Amino acid sequence: MKGWVNNVKKNRFEIDMCNGSIMDKLISFSLPLMVSGILQLAFNAVDIIVVGRFSGSQALAAVGSTTALINVFTNLFIGISLGANVLAARFYAAGKDREMSETVHTSITLALISGIMMAVIGVLLAKWALEIMGTPDDVIGQSALYMRIYFMGMPFFMLYNYGAAILRAIGDTKRPLIFLIISGIANAALNMILVILFHMGVAGVAIGTIISQLISCVLVLTCLYRSEGSYQLRFSKLKINGAYMEQIFQVGVPAGIQSTVINLSNALLQSSVNSFGSIAMAGYTAANNILGFLYMSVNSITQACMSFTSQNYGVGKLKRMDKVLRDCAILSISIAAVLGGLAYSFGPLILTVYTSDPKVINCGMEILAYTSITYFLCGIMDLFPGALRGMGYSAVPMVLSVIGTVGTRIVWVFGIFPNHRSLSVLFVSYPVSWIITIVLQVVCFYFVRKRVHQKEKRLL
């Protein structure tokens, strides 16, 4: 089985993660993923820029105030797609075609069901959730309208993400990038038409997003349908296999819970920002969008770490897994340090793209001062859970992330912030929580790695 990956014939989109140089393959895998993430945010930024410029600061605040909530609702199911990625990568590397096919069809079925569930939940609970967050009266109507329309496209969003996770499992990050470019251009064009030409405001932005998600969904499903080999999709075979769903959930549910709970802490911070009014909300929206570019950059390395670790774990190459983590750490720190420094240095100029209001720009810079420069810490923090998930260990990293990240921010918001009310004090919680979580994750990784190596020695 360990030799199977040496003999498998790769198509031009796939990457052999188990043999040869690691760094250049990490870059080949991560770069399209990074560009995909950045382009996705760029197209989302077009949404924000267009609505801010042509529909006003209240519309900008309305769209921005939904971000944390949308992430809370969706990230549990997106996290489960990581379980599909890990399981598919392991079966693909080991040459288990039947198991790979079952994983693909179970994953796509789960995506469809979860997408429909999210659409119903989002439409029904949008305004209630916004009220719980203390969204100001002057923007809550537009915020609720945006969320309800946005959630109607959840089935397309989920199907694309799960389909792309399958492609990443085989080392293909290029085709999802192509699909994203096509759908993103369509989204930008629809924004121009619906918001600028037809003056539809936040509704126009949401409708454009749904249509673009439909396009990317159709493209990724068509790609899987036309593929050859174990990851080929056949709609007649769509069903849930309980055994494979359980394995997907073992990795994916803890990852999803972690992401959801962390976004709940971000929603808590959003509520604190809301208490400063619509100017601070708009500044946070713009700054958070910039931070999103940094996150997508380091997250591409985390995704690479997870996929490479999973494939090498599947064929028993444990020493290579250590080298994967080392090279990923070098890449993540370097990228985050450079991009974070640039984001802060050119922050005032970048923020003017989102708004011309100097008060909003000042709020955005106040937030970036404590988050962009220290963002390399976030990259390090996510790498260790990524490696652990690649080995099938997901629950403990989830608990530690919740304790380190969410616990710290809750203590900060309720214990420190009320006595020192400022955006600066509020967002110092980011680097503090990252450092605490890194310490916890490194200790966890050390013990799990030791256990895995001891287990391998007993099998030899």
Describe each model-derived feature in a short phrase.
Residues 1-30, 88-153, 197-253, 309-374, ...:
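Short alpha-helical transmembrane segments in multi-pass integral membrane proteins
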Residues 55-68, 147, 206, 278-293, ...:
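Small-residue hotspots at the loop-to-helix junctions and early N-terminal turns
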Residues 60-120, 157-176, 283-347, 378-401, ...:
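Small-residue-rich hydrophobic transmembrane alpha-helices
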Residues 81, 150-168, 176-187, 205-220, ...:
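Short runs within selected transmembrane alpha-helices of multi-pass transporters and secretion channels
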